[in-house]
């Protein structure tokens, strides 16, 4: 991001001061050591009707109207449902009823040429606040890593009230917006002081049994319109119907924002809990940051129990749960994982998830 030299120097001075203050958090850097399909062919047409209706929270008559048009291919039918504008209203109703619309922007449209030399970095991290073990130490480590990486924008999931102080202290560097503080757990969006915030919305998923929301922050960076969408979708394989419906709703919201705000920079991500086969067709022009950066297997798995032993009962599983999608005039991206350092004092990692960190540029 760009701003006046005085502002940049002031923020950098604060960041260095905070790094000194939390030097008691010792982090040992470790060397970096190096999942199910839809059973389409084995299912009867009746089973496909039932499965489609459950996943999409519709009925079997509706399911038949789509399945018969794609030769009863369940995967294709789900792609049609979640990717077509024609079913946006049905998808929205499945998640939460009628949704609010984002106001269109009158901001000037900037091209990649206009933004040469301009970069924006976005980090997303499920910080596992629900695990009470060594929580304060882990939150200090999270804050320590955030200050070292220094992203412009930070999405957090599984934030809890207990031992929140290290995260709250980041307000000297960031503007902090919580989704539903006081709830059992929630999300947060942190933005650089150079980000001009115009609006903050929280949409509660009515089909969620886990307090899940979509948090939306609208603002601008140096005249460039920016929308930030942070979410934590329904967890576990058995809650796939709710998760798929929530993901479809979020992508409809992204599509709506793009249509109403040409040239805006849109970031959508978080702990999506997605399996690859659950990803439906995303809107045109929207890219997956990890894929766009080259799909490096070294940075693929964000929940990896082979390398992260915080959740010992799940050893042997690794998933790409945490994802970041974007659209806009910044068309290139660099992608890394952060938070892979073990904390010396408690011999655990800051979270059971790695943080994803992406830098976007023209």
From Swiss-Prot:
Enzyme Commission (EC) number: 3.1.4.-
Cofactors (names): Mg(2+); Mn(2+)
UniProt biased composition (Acidic residues): 1-10, 21-33
Pfam family, one: Exo_endo_phos
Binding site for Mg(2+): 128, 158
Annotated CDD domains: TDP2 (cd09080), UBA_ceTYDP2_like (cd14672)
Region called Interaction with 5' end of substrate DNA, residue ranges: 126-130, 232-237, 273-275
Annotated site location: Interaction with 5' end of substrate DNA: 185, 303, 321, 353
Cell compartments where the protein resides: Nucleus; Nucleus, PML body
GO cellular component term, pick one: PML body
Matching SUPFAM superfamilies: DNase I-like, UBA-like
Cofactor info, note text: Binds 1 magnesium or manganese ion per subunit.
Chain residue ranges for the region called Disordered: 1-43
Disruption phenotype: Suppresses axon regeneration defect in mxl-1 background mutant. Suppresses the axon regeneration defect in sdz-33 background mutant.
Key words, A-Z: DNA damage, DNA repair, Hydrolase, Magnesium, Metal-binding, Nuclease, Nucleus
Coiled coil: none
Top-rank EC class of the record's enzyme: hydrolase
Main location: nucleus
GO biological process: double-strand break repair
Subunit structure: Interacts with mxl-1; the interaction promotes axon regeneration after injury. Interacts with ets-4; the interaction is required for the sumoylation of ets-4.
Function: DNA repair enzyme that can remove a variety of covalent adducts from DNA through hydrolysis of a 5'-phosphodiester bond, giving rise to DNA with a free 5' phosphate. Catalyzes the hydrolysis of dead-end complexes between DNA and the topoisomerase 2 (top2) active site tyrosine residue. Hydrolyzes 5'-phosphoglycolates on protruding 5' ends on DNA double-strand breaks (DSBs) due to DNA damage by radiation and free radicals.
UniProt record similarity statement: Belongs to the CCR4/nocturin family. TTRAP/TDP2 subfamily.
UniProt-recorded name of the protein: 5'-tyrosyl-DNA phosphodiesterase
Organism: Caenorhabditis elegans
């Amino acid at each position: 991001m760009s701003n006046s030299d005085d502002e940049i120097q002031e923020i950098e001075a604060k960041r260095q001061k905070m790094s000194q203050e939390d030097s008691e958090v010792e982090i040992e850097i470790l060397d970096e050591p190096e999942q199910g399909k839809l059973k389409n062919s084995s299912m009867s047409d009746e089973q496909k009707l039932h499965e489609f209706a459950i996943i999409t929270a519709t009925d079997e008559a509706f399911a038949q109207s789509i399945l018969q048009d794609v030769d009863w291919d369940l995967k294709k039918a789900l792609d049609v449902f979640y990717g077509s504008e024609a079913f946006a209203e049905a998808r929205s109703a499945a998640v939460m009823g009628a949704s609010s619309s984002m106001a269109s922007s009158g901001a000037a449209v900037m091209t990649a040429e206009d933004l040469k030399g301009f970069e924006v970095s976005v980090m997303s991290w499920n910080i596992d606040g629900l695990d009470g073990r060594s929580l304060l130490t882990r939150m200090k480590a999270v804050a320590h890593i955030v200050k070292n990486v220094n992203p412009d924008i930070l999405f957090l999931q599984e934030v809890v009230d207990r031992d929140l102080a290290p995260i709250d202290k980041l307000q000297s560097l960031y503007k902090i917006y919580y989704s539903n503080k006081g709830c059992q757990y929630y999300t947060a969006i942190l933005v650089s002081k150079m980000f001009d915030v115009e609006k903050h919305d929280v949409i509660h998923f009515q089909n969620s049994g886990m307090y899940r929301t979509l948090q939306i922050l609208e603002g601008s960076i140096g005249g460039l319109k920016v929308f930030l969408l942070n979410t934590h979708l329904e967890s576990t394989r058995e809650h796939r119907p709710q998760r798929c419906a929530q993901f479809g709703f979020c992508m409809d919201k992204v599509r709506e924002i793009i249509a109403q705000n040409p040239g805006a920079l849109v970031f959508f991500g978080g702990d999506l809990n997605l399996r690859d086969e659950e990803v439906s067709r995303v809107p045109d022009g929207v890219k997956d940051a990890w894929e766009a950066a080259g799909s490096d297997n070294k940075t693929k798995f964000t929940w990896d129990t082979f390398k992260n032993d915080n959740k010992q009962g799940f050893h042997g599983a690794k998933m790409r749960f945490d994802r970041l999608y974007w659209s806009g005039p910044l068309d290139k991206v660099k992608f890394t994982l952060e938070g892979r350092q073990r904390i010396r004092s408690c011999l655990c990692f800051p979270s059971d998830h790695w943080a994803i960190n992406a830098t976007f540029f023209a």
